[in-house]
Amino acid sequence: MRKDETSNTSPDISVAQPASALRYHLRPPRRNDGAAIHQLVSECPPLDLNSLYAYLLLCEHHAHTCVVAESPGGRIDGFVSAYLLPTRPDVLFVWQVAVHSRARGHRLGRAMLGHILERQECRHVRHLETTVGPDNQASRRTFAGLAGERGAHVSEQPFFDRQAFGGADHDDEMLLRIGPFTHPPH
């Protein structure tokens, strides 16, 4: 059994919905989750859909810094891709946060981010960085909420302007930097 296939002893999180409560198991992605993650991201506009191969590589090479939210029926309704920056290993860079529409509005994205930060492999992380488009208010709320939970500051600066995307119809990407993380969440 591979390291990322071992049982996860962290508790499931409850995500309350108006008429019921769904329980999601948060765990590192496995190699065989790649296709389901690719499908999930395709159903989560405005996220950029990467190749299936890219998601397979994330599952294989970065499982320790990525997470899936799995429903009791085994459906993947959430995914966060992230990695430690090679030149600054105390910085976790979050690439994508995908939450299916059926699971939105219950802070699942924030819970998945917190789950990654609590892993042993990320105990040394002092900052989280991510990029967001200027109009992506849902992502901005998620990251602001995470910063508030952890008593951290959020700063913003330009990262990629639209010209960097080679003429593709793409918004500017702003870099959000959250940290430093000085204490566990309350």
From Swiss-Prot:
GO aspect biological process, one term: ectoine biosynthetic process
Superkingdom of this protein's organism: Bacteria
Alphabetical list of InterPro entries matching this protein: Acyl_CoA_acyltransferase, Bact_Acetyltransf, Ectoine_EctA, GNAT_dom
Protein name: L-2,4-diaminobutyric acid acetyltransferase
Gene3D superfamilies xrefs: 3.40.630.30
Acyltransferase in keyword set: yes
EC top class named in words: transferase
Domain N-acetyltransferase stretches: 24-179
The UniProt record lists the keyword Acyltransferase: yes
Keyword tags: Acyltransferase, Transferase
GO molecular function per UniProt: diaminobutyrate acetyltransferase activity
PANTHER family tied to this protein: AMINOALKYLPHOSPHONATE N-ACETYLTRANSFERASE-RELATED-RELATED
Enzyme Commission code(s) on record: 2.3.1.178
Family affiliation: Belongs to the acetyltransferase family. EctA subfamily.
Pathway: Amine and polyamine biosynthesis; ectoine biosynthesis; L-ectoine from L-aspartate 4-semialdehyde: step 2/3
Signal peptide positions (record): none
